C-alpha cells in the first residue's frame, strides 16, 4: 500500500492518504489516558474526531517514526505506547495496539490505556 504522509495545519495533525482511498488524520495533540468505556463515551457524539480502529492504529504504527518526526516538527506530541482501538474483542475486552511495534492484543475495558484521536473517511 502506498501512503502520502504530511502535516495538515487545518486539523493540527498528520494527514495519511492511502492508494485505496482512505484518508486518516492523526491528532497532533497529546494522547489521553482513560478506560476503553470512557474513550468510547468521550468520542461518541464527536463529528470530526473518533476512536481509531485496530486497522488504523496498525497503519500508523507501521510508519510511526516518520509520523512522529512530522508531529515533532510541527510542535505536536509524539505517539508512543499502547493505545485503545474502537474495536471490541468481547464483552469484557477491547483491542489495543502498541505504537512502537504494531502488535495488537486484547485487554480489559476498565483498564487505562492511551487514546489518540483520528479523523477517518473514505475519499473514493
Locate the predicted segments by residue.
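Extracellular adhesion/carbohydrate-recognition regions
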Residues: 1-49, 81, 85, 93-96, ...
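C-terminal, surface-exposed recognition/capping segments
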Residues: 54-124
Amino acid at each position: 500500500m502506498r501512503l502520502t504522509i504530511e502535516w495538515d495545519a487545518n486539523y493540527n495533525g498528520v494527514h495519511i492518504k492511502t492508494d485505496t482511498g482512505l484518508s486518516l488524520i492523526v491528532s497532533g495533540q497529546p494522547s489521553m489516558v482513560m478506560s476503553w468505556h470512557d474513550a468510547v463515551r468521550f468520542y461518541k457524539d464527536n463529528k470530526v474526531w473518533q476512536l481509531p480502529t485496530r486497522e488504523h492504529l496498525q497503519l500508523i504504527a507501521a510508519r510511526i517514526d516518520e509520523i512522529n518526526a512530522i508531529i515533532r516538527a510541527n510542535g505536536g506530541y509524539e505517539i508512543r505506547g499502547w493505545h485503545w482501538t474502537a474495536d471490541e474483542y468481547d464483552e469484557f475486552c477491547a483491542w489495543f495496539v502498541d505504537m512502537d511495534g504494531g502488535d495488537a492484543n486484547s485487554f480489559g475495558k476498565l483498564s487505562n490505556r492511551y487514546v489518540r484521536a483520528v479523523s477517518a473517511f473514505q475519499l473514493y
